[in-house]
From Swiss-Prot:
GO biological process terms held by the UniProt record: translation
Listed InterPro entries: Ribosomal_uL29 (IPR001854), Ribosomal_uL29_CS (IPR018254), Ribosomal_uL29_sf (IPR036049)
NCBIfam families per UniProt: L29
Organism from which the protein derives: Sulfurisphaera tokodaii (strain DSM 16993 / JCM 10545 / NBRC 100140 / 7) (Sulfolobus tokodaii)
Cysteines joined through disulfide linkages: none
Protein name, per record: Large ribosomal subunit protein uL29
HAMAP family: Ribosomal_uL29 (MF_00374)
Lineage: Archaea, Thermoproteota, Thermoprotei, Sulfolobales, Sulfolobaceae
Pfam families, per the entry: Ribosomal_L29
A GO term, aspect molecular function: structural constituent of ribosome
UniProt signal peptide: none
């Protein structure tokens, strides 16, 4: 059975990483998220002005943002679980 991937990140791989690695991935994803949000804002302005050529790009950016938010949620839960396990 093939494991699920989101934006090139294997979900099963995430659970096998250390807290430090997860925090590093989280920072990387937050940077990508900020970039995508800025790009989405630019595209929305272009759409308002009528200069946007590819209207589907807004929808695709929103989907990518949702994927990153999903990954961040998974990573945050995994970090919490690993911290709880280390306290035991």
């Amino acid at each position: 059975m093939k494991s699920k991937e989101i934006l090139g990140y294997d979900i099963k791989e995430i659970s096998n990483q250390t807290v430090e690695q997860l925090i590093e991935k989280k920072k990387e994803l937050q940077g990508k998220l900020n970039d995508l949000q800025q790009e989405l804002l630019k595209r929305k302005v272009e759409a308002r002005m009528g200069t946007l050529k590819n209207t589907a790009s807004i929808r695709n950016l929103r989907k990518d943002i949702a994927r990153i938010l999903t990954l961040l949620s998974i990573i945050n839960k995994e970090i919490e679980n690993k911290k709880k396990e280390s306290k035991k």
